Amino acid sequence: ENKDSVANPLRVDVIANNEVQHLIDSFVKAYEQRNDAAVNQLIHPDLGLTIIYRPGVADTFTKIETFDFKKPIPAYYAYPEAKSSYNLTFDKLPDYDCATEKWNKVGLYCDTTVRPVQLSQIVAFELEFEPHKYAKEQITEIQKSEKDSYRVILTGENPLVFHLQKYNDNWYVTVLDRA
């Protein structure tokens, strides 16, 4: 079992859902073209975009309202170029092997049978050291958003990993995972 996700007991068959595929394709294309305006159209203003990154040993995250390729988070790590010639595949997400520095499969994947829990894991870890870092409402909001989200991975030299979330009957990009 992948520790970065948990089984989604209410599996929604989005394989035939053109809206999800369109959002994923649109985000990958906008990111490839480094088009801030197009990326920002895929982010809901109420949800913002959460960026996961690793400033040291442990992952952390920050939430932003708008995305800007010229203002990366963290500032010392520019957003790398991403390239995709792959069609979207709805299947188990690829795994990255740190020892070989390779993915176990290549392509663009979205797994609709599990939900991402990276943010909850980061919060749980950070609360061990800073018990008052997050308000109860923030934790509840993160957990609720994860229940309505899917993780997408584009493998490659510069992988692109992001989450999409259903909100008010529409899908939006809500997390960019740079860790």
Task: Kindly give the residue locations of the regions a language model identified.
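Short, well-ordered alpha-helical segments enriched in acidic and aromatic residues
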Residues: N35-D46
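C-terminal-biased regions
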Residues: K3-A16, Q21-H22, H44-A179
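Residue-level detector of short, conserved catalytic/binding motifs and their immediate flanks
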Residues: F27, A37, F162
